[in-house]
């Protein structure tokens, strides 16, 4: 969640599943001793270019997804998905909430998420994803704070031909 706790860093349009484990989780998660939130994102559209735009008094977002190589039966394919959110609570607050802190809610955030997925005809796949989440708090008379979370990652599934073994990572 962002600095004021009302907005998630994850765009719900990119989520495939979210699982929360408070105890008793498997070795799949390493030696964790605390709770785990396992977030899985979906792949982009494999057949058509598609998008979504949304705006509210607090934020706006867009999502764009589509094939890099269109899906065909028994052939490899690839897709992309990108999502961006931006808040303008700092700008809209004086009009919507003039009674709160003299109309000043000095919070802004932005979220960027992207994922590329490549699928082979035989079932193997690899995904490369990245994110950039930013928060800013600007109390004009006293202090300003800003922080960023960035990350890159990969996930793969290897299905060797003629083998009963699957390699996942």
What residue spans do the PLM features occupy?
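Transmembrane beta-barrel architecture of outer-membrane proteins
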Residues: 5, 15, 32-34, 48, ...
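Short active-site oxyanion
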Residues: 48-52, 79
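Flexible, glycine/serine/threonine-rich loop segments and coil->beta-strand junctions
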Residues: 1-13, 21-36, 45-49
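Transmembrane beta-barrel wall of Gram-negative outer-membrane proteins
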Residues: 58-86, 99-136, 145-168
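Outer-membrane beta-barrel proteins
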Residues: 89-95, 135-141
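Helix-turn-helix DNA-binding segment
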Residues: 18
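Histidine-centered metal-chelating micro-motifs
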Residues: 24-26, 60-62, 89
